[in-house]
Regions:
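Intrinsically disordered, low-complexity
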Residues: 1-24, 73, 123-135
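Alpha-helix initiation/capping motif
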Residues: 6, 30-34, 120
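...with weaker cross-activation on analogous glycine-rich loops/strands in unrelated enzymes
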Residues: 11, 51-114, 135
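A generic alpha-helix preference that emphasizes hydrophobic side chains
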Residues: 14, 37-38, 93, 128
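Residue-level detector of conserved, well-ordered beta-strand and adjacent loop positions
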Residues: 18, 28, 54, 82-84, ...
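Catalytic cysteine-centered active-site loop
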Residues: 19, 23-77, 126-127
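Short hydrophobic/aromatic patches on the structural cores and recognition surfaces of FHA
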Residues: 40, 96, 131
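A short, polar/proline- and glycine-enriched secondary-structure boundary/capping micro-motif
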Residues: 115-119
Length: 135
């Protein structure tokens, strides 16, 4: 799969996230050398902005301090994205950062590293829960 980085320097959160591509997935890790999914979003936000977000994917996804985006089509570069990988009632157990062009960056337990994945037309489209706009 080929990814385009033409947008990469347009958003500071994406710039930070891209620096960590290929770093290993480790459950409960919050960086900078390894991450789990919410540790990755937590670390990137904390590094770039003057605020922190909740630590777990569930708490990040349900934090009503930030605008909720219910449609993939409404996502903007830098939005956090949340997925229901377990397909259970909480609807929010995986987190990543939308980087544009139908792609998001995340610490993937399946891929065992920080990676970029597409949303539409993939497994992730079917389990997309919502996004949150931080700024």
């Amino acid at each position: 799969m080929c990814f385009s980085f033409t947008y990469a320097f347009a958003h500071p959160l994406v710039d930070e996230a891209i620096l960590h591509l290929e770093k290993p997935y480790v459950y409960s890790a919050t960086g900078p050398d390894s991450f789990d999914c919410s540790g990755f979003t937590y670390y990137c936000v904390d590094t770039v902005y003057d605020f922190t977000i909740e630590r777990t994917a569930y708490k990040q996804g349900y934090d009503e301090s930030y605008y909720k985006i219910n449609s993939i089509a409404q996502l903007q570069v830098g939005d956090l994205v949340f997925f229901d990988t377990k397909r259970d009632k909480d609807k929010c157990d995986h987190a990543g950062i939308y980087i544009g062009n139908n792609q998001f960056i995340h610490a993937s337990s399946a891929g065992e590293k920080v990676t970029i994945s597409e949303i539409r037309g993939t497994f992730y489209e079917g389990i997309f829960s919502w996004g949150r706009r931080l700024i």
